[in-house]
């Protein structure tokens, strides 16, 4: 335990917390324009073609964002909303596109977990 005199001479140093999603700049979501839509492969031991897109955000950042769900309608110049959240098996992908917002359509024929994929409640 430090004495008061020691604390007067050299105060305690606050820990600096580094953000996992710096491009969002403390906002919940950000809007951007797709510059490239492509597929990439995950790291070992997984195998797939993951759908991702490169996005130029309104604040000037250029980030890679994952497109969740089965099928999508994104292409170059599509305006999308991104949120934080990394994809563990894709290095460098730290953002998710928000389905059902702006130009990104919701997932077709989705029945469960609809809110995460921008799907309205089906008619009974």
From Swiss-Prot:
Top-level taxonomic group:
Bacteria
Does the entry feature the keyword Cell division, yes or no? no
**GO CC, alphabetical:** ribosome; small ribosomal subunit
One Pfam match: Ribosom_S12_S23
* Signal peptide annotation: none
What protein does this entry describe?
Small ribosomal subunit protein uS12
Q: Does the keyword NAD apply?
A: no
Q: Which family does it belong to?
A: Belongs to the universal ribosomal protein uS12 family.
What would changing residue 81 to V do, according to UniProt?
A: In streptomycin resistant stra1
Q: Which GO terms describe its molecular function?
A: rRNA binding; structural constituent of ribosome; tRNA binding
Positions of transmembrane segments: none
Report the function annotation for this chain. Answer: With S4 and S5 plays an important role in translational accuracy. Interacts with and stabilizes bases of the 16S rRNA that are involved in tRNA selection in the A site and with the mRNA backbone. Located at the interface of the 30S and 50S subunits, it traverses the body of the 30S subunit contacting proteins on the other side and probably holding the rRNA structure together. The combined cluster of proteins S8, S12 and S17 appears to hold together the shoulder and platform of the 30S subunit.
Matches recorded under InterPro entries:
NA-bd_OB-fold, Ribosomal_uS12, Ribosomal_uS12_bac
